[in-house]
Amino acid sequence: MALPPFFAQSRQGPPPPQPPPSAPFGCPPPPLPSPAFPPPLPQRPGPFPGASAPFLQPPLALQPRAPAEASRGGGGGGAFFPVPPPPLPPPPPQCRPFPGPDAVERPRPPPPGPGPPWSPRWAEAPPPPDVLGDAALQRLRDRQWLEAVFGNPRRPGGLRTPRTPAGPSLGEVRARLRSALRLVRRLRSLGQSLREAEADGAAWASLHAQAAPLRAELAERLQPLRQAAYVGEARRRLERVRRRVRVRERARDRRLSGRRGAQRTEREQEIDRWRVKCVQEVEEKKRDEELKAAADGVLAEVRKKQSDTKRMVDILRALEKLRKLRKEAAARKGVCPPASADETFEHHLQRLRKLIKKRSELYEAEERALRVMLEGEQEEERRRELEKKQRKEKEKLLLQKREIESKLFGDPDEFPLAHLLQPFRQYYLQAEHSLPALIQIRHDWDQYLVPSDHPKGNSVPQGWVLPPLPSNDIWATAIQLH
C-alpha cells in the first residue's frame, strides 16, 4: 500500500481523479476529492478485519527520515529505526439504504476544485520536510489526524426520512376535550336561544352567525379524536400512566404493609415481654407464699413450744399476784403466814422462772437453726430456678448462634466432612477447639487496642456482624430469606 502524500519523501501533487467504480447493492460511489468531500485517509492493514483503532502519530524522533535529512540533522548522530506510521481512522460512511422503486437519484458531488488555503485536509500534498521543518510537519500531521477522527461526519445528500411525529400527550388530549366540552355547552345554549328566537329573523341570524364559528372550531377540535391512531395512542399513554400509578400504589402499599408489620411485630414483642414479666412476678409471689407456708409448717412445733413457755410465764405471774392478794386478805383477818412459807414460794418461783427461761432460749436457738436451714433451702431453690433460667437463655443463645452459623457457613447437619468448604469452616472456627489458636487470634486483635477516649476507637463486636436487611423489594427478590 502506498504511503499518503504527507509521508512521501518527494511528491509533487495529488493523483489525477479516477472514474468511480460501480457500487453494489445501491451504495453510492465514493466521492471524489473536492472541498465538499475531502479525500479519505489511508489505512494500514492490521491483524483484525475492519478499520483499525485510531492511534496518535508516533513522536518525530521515531519516524523514518530521509537519508539526506538524517545527514543534515546535527548533534547526536544516532540511527533511526524505520518505524511505520500508526493506522488512521476510516472516513465517515457514505452509503445509504437500498433504494426502492420510488427513490430518486443521489446528486453527484461537485467536481474537484481548489480548496481553501487554510484547510490542510484537501488533496494537495504538504510541502517537503525541507521547507516546513520537523515541528511544523508534526503539527500538520496531528491536525489532519484530529480532523479525521473528531471532525463532524458529513451526512449524505439524499432525501431525509421525515421524522415520525410524536403521539399526543395526555395534557393535550385533556385540554382538547375540555375545550370541546366548553364549545358544546356554548352551542347548546345558542341552540336554545335559536329555538326561542325563531320568530325574530334578525336575532336568529345574529345567533346563527355566532354559532357557525363555534361549530367550525368544535369540528376542528374533534377532528383528531375521530382518528383511530390518535385515540389508540392516547389510550396507550393513558394505560401506561395508569399502570405506572398502579405500580407506585402497590409499592407504597408494600412499604406501608411492611412498616405496619414491623410495628405490629414490635407491639407483639412488647406485649410478650410484659406478659412474661407479669407471669414471673406472679410466680415469684406464689413461690414466696409456698416457701413461707413450708417455713410455717416446719416452725409450727417450735412456735407452739414458745407459746407454751409464754403461757407458763403468765401463769407464774398470775400465781404470784394471787398469793399476794390472799396474803393481804389473811393479814386483814389477823392471820399471818410464817416467813418460811414465803421463802419456799419464792424459791419455787425462781426455779420455775429459770427453767422457763432456759426452755425459751433453747426454743429460740432451735427456731434460729430452722430459719437458717429454711433460708438455705430457699436460696438453693432460687439458685436452681436461676440456673434453670440461665440454662434456657443459654440454649436460646446457642440456638440463635447455631442459626447464624448455619446462615453463614451452612447447616452442620447437612455439612459433610468431605465438603469443599470444610477447610474454611475449620479455619474460622478453630478458636472453639484449640486454645493456642484462641490465644493467637486474641493477640492479633489486641494489636489494634486503643485507649477508651480515642476518637476512632470502638469495641470489638461480641458476635457475628450480620448483613442488613434488603433496602428495597427488587434486592429482596434476589435474596432467599428463611
Curated annotation (Swiss-Prot):
Annotated region (Disordered), positions in chain: 1-136, 151-170
PANTHER family cross-referenced by the UniProt entry: PROGRAMMED CELL DEATH PROTEIN 7
GO annotation, biological process: apoptotic process; positive regulation of apoptotic signaling pathway; positive regulation of T cell apoptotic process; response to glucocorticoid; RNA splicing
Cell compartment(s), UniProt: Nucleus
Name the record gives this protein: Programmed cell death protein 7
InterPro entries linked: Apoptosis_promoter, PDCD7
Coiled-coil spans in chain: 233-408
Pro residues bias (residue ranges): 13-48, 82-100, 109-130
Stimuli inducing this protein: Upon induction of apoptosis in embryonic stem cells by treatment with dexamethasone, staurosporine or C2-ceramide.
Residue stretches of biased makeup (Low complexity): 49-71, 151-168
Native source species: Mus musculus
Gene: Pdcd7
Known tissue expression: Highly expressed in testis, thymus and lymph nodes. Detected at low levels in embryonic stem cells.
Subunit architecture: Interacts with RBM40. Component of the U11/U12 snRNPs that are part of the U12-type spliceosome.
Its job: Promotes apoptosis when overexpressed.
Keyword entries, A-Z: Apoptosis, Coiled coil, Nucleus
Pfam families assigned to the protein according to its UniProt record, in alphabetical order: PDCD7 (PF16021)
Domain of life: Eukaryota
Cellular component GO terms held in the UniProt record: spliceosomal complex; U12-type spliceosomal complex; U2AF complex
